[in-house]
């Protein structure tokens, strides 16, 4: 419970007490490691994870160990551990996801795509793998491939807002503004409080020539949420039909002003 609530220090203390009674308590080791990583003390998580990995034939422990090793700058060791875990059969899919992410962070996104494709070949029905592969294609600037994979994921899980927003983003980046707008509307119908999707929908509307509707949508995003000013101003600036302001105060002044109404004769 403490770990889920992100009360990392409480979780660390509870796990430590459990390990005093039973040093081989696998669940306590996992909780302790996650808590230490959450506290920014990843280096302290490595030794208990290494000991647990030697005692247990456990891919979850091995994957977290690989993550921790990469997190403290021991990236070659971490990737080697993750490759070893990914080679297990039956496959442990989170190891592929972690391995692909770490390799992508090293700059070899093409290799990361290959790892995700390998994982998907082992578990073709996994929607989560399809989503991760689509995201990886976007990082590799392969927008068409991303849209193809994410469209398949949407067909398999039409109610997943994370898939819908990623597919919409791929369409937006690919210049398919009408498709992106429709997909963002679908996602917002399922999760109306997604402010980032509302801002991106506004960009789509402006690109489609609906500048007034787009700016109205951005005003709605900003209203009562001053912390969203940077994102809203960026949305206006990145649109080819948007507006650019040199000062945040100028953007705020424009967005806080209601648009003038045209008098009807």
Segments (PLM) and residue ranges:
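Structural signature of alpha-solenoid helical repeat scaffolds
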Residues: 20, 53-54, 87, 121, ...
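TPR/TPR-like (Sel1-like) alpha-helical repeat modules
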Residues: 55, 195, 199-230, 252-259
